[in-house]
Amino acid sequence: MGREFLGLFEEWADSYDQSVEGYDEEYREVFANYEDILNTVASKAGSVVLEFGVGTGNLTKKLLEQGKTVYGIEPSEPMRKKAREKLGDKVLIVDGDFLQFPLPPKPIDTIVSTYAFHHLTDEEKGEAIAKYSQLLKKGDKIVFADTAFRDRQAFQRAIEEARERGFHHLADDLGREYYTTLDVLTKLFKENGFTVTFTQKNAFVWVMEAVKQ
């Protein structure tokens, strides 16, 4: 369910914001256009939002600035602490993950996440989308931004290019976690009653907007 990677992200809590700001050369392209990615997800969201993988609260902050109600889910206590330092008491952030989480206290119209859905296997992604379909009504949305690839060949090329550039942490990350392809995501959303569109934001990250039918 993604929690097998929790230790890595608890170690990353103190330096995550430096990484997204481009100070980590290996991940610079992964986080290229980061502000635009956050703004795009926030602007596509409705008024009452469930956010998975809050992290240090960067997307949450954008959502709040746009006047949205946000219920945050984050499995890492160090990350929750960082988010609370950034956001104060403006938002409720609770322990949970993509598959096991407390239900929000009021109906939601959008589920969002950035840079996190790849912690789930493709099978778990399908389970998660099925759960979310039960929480959403017709016209409601799932808006995720995450690393994904057009096809398996593009995925393999990305790993090979990272190795060639000496970006071994990035290459290991791409090989270790559960990054997927657009055709797999399209199938999973369609099977659970969504239409989905994809917009590429950098060499790695796509914004996926799935609308409940």
From Swiss-Prot:
Entry-linked Gene3D superfamilies: Vaccinia Virus protein VP39
Enzyme Commission number(s): 2.1.1.-
Protein's UniProt keywords contain S-adenosyl-L-methionine: yes
Recorded family membership: Belongs to the methyltransferase superfamily. YrrT family.
Superkingdom per UniProt: Bacteria
GO molecular function: rRNA (adenine-N6,N6-)-dimethyltransferase activity
HAMAP family in the record: Methyltr_YrrT (MF_02100)
Protein name, UniProt field: Uncharacterized methyltransferase GWCH70_2477
Keyword Lipid biosynthesis annotated: no
